[in-house]
């Protein structure tokens, strides 16, 4: 456990921050995680790191007290996705995601697979990747605005038993109106300063903007992992979250 434990989180409070551990290997990941505090953030492992390190690193991080978002974006036949979700639940994973475009039967199978667990992972649907624009959707045969496709897939995910969706912060407000206050909205593309940002996530917002728009969790990678003082960044985002909640 990191010794720099803060008193931020009470039973009535939660941190909205999910730190994306976009490292290439276990050594760099564990070296960085020593700078974090499990009461100030959740953490996320994606395809590159999980492929490189496998289950052992994920379980090590969970054993250190972190809530883990396993970001593997499952998209397969219903049985395969259901079995993968059961494995994630057995590991103690806090959140796992899948492409909502995999369809109702796939998502319902996933929800049924983890329903019997006392503490089950949150099941999150991936709607439209934040790197995609309308021209990208058109190239795959979807002549629809990204925000319309997000709402369509989010409604499908909710009615199929999922707990929430990944969406850009710009879609958070309309999704709140459509799907209610209890549906989880996980928002990537969060930057401390959006000015001059030209990275691979097109629809970005600051933490304050995203929380005001209705996001539940904020995925932050480089703004935390490349910060001189990651804990200071986390404390500031959590301070903003408290202001938005009050």
Swiss-Prot record:
Family: Belongs to the OMP decarboxylase family. Type 1 subfamily.
Complexes and interactors: Homodimer.
Keywords: Decarboxylase, Lyase, Pyrimidine biosynthesis
GO BP terms: 'de novo' pyrimidine nucleobase biosynthetic process; 'de novo' UMP biosynthetic process
A cellular component annotation (GO) from this entry: cytosol
Cited SUPFAM superfamilies: Ribulose-phoshate binding barrel
Coiled coil: none
Reaction(s) the record says it catalyses: orotidine 5'-phosphate + H(+) = UMP + CO2
InterPro entries xref list: Aldolase_TIM, OMPdecase, OMPdecase_AS, OMPdecase_bac, OMPdeCOase_dom, RibuloseP-bd_barrel
Pathway(s) the chain acts in: Pyrimidine metabolism; UMP biosynthesis via de novo pathway; UMP from orotate: step 2/2
Function statement: Catalyzes the decarboxylation of orotidine 5'-monophosphate (OMP) to uridine 5'-monophosphate (UMP).
Record: residues binding substrate: 22, 44, 71-80, 130, 191, 201, 221-222
Protein name: Orotidine 5'-phosphate decarboxylase
Organism: Neisseria meningitidis serogroup C (strain 053442)
Gene Ontology molecular function, alphabetical: orotidine-5'-phosphate decarboxylase activity
Any one Pfam family match given in the protein's UniProt record, by short name: OMPdecase
Active site, per annotation: 73
Entry EC number(s): 4.1.1.23
